[in-house]
Amino acid sequence: MQRFHIEVLLALVTGWCALALPVFATDHTHYDAAFLPVMRDVVEGIRPLSLGLLFVAGVCLGVFAAAPTWVLGLGSVASLPAWSAIDMFMGEDHNLFPIEWTIYALYALTSTIGAILGRAIRKQIIW
């Protein structure tokens, strides 16, 4: 695998962990879903700490990864619209999915801004 693909996969994993860990670390409501109910728990239970961790993940990715910052930002939340689409096709009701995906884009913006800040930090550090 090329470095770019590894970095995008790393962004996906770190982004999902940043969103999921605060949800699972506290008491949360368990939701039913046609596909991966655990993902619905994450989507319905996102907390401000989740977004803060997503920003920190973006900063770390921006410092250490070479992929474009917008790719890192989108990659960090790519699991959310992917889950939403699969869940829709399996019969769940996502009648407000355009709004849902707009919110996911705002989450990606959080991570992208973090990655841009990480790039600025990397330029200031002498390796």
Predicted stretch roles:
Residues 14-25, 74-88:
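Aromatic-anchored segments of alpha-helical transmembrane domains
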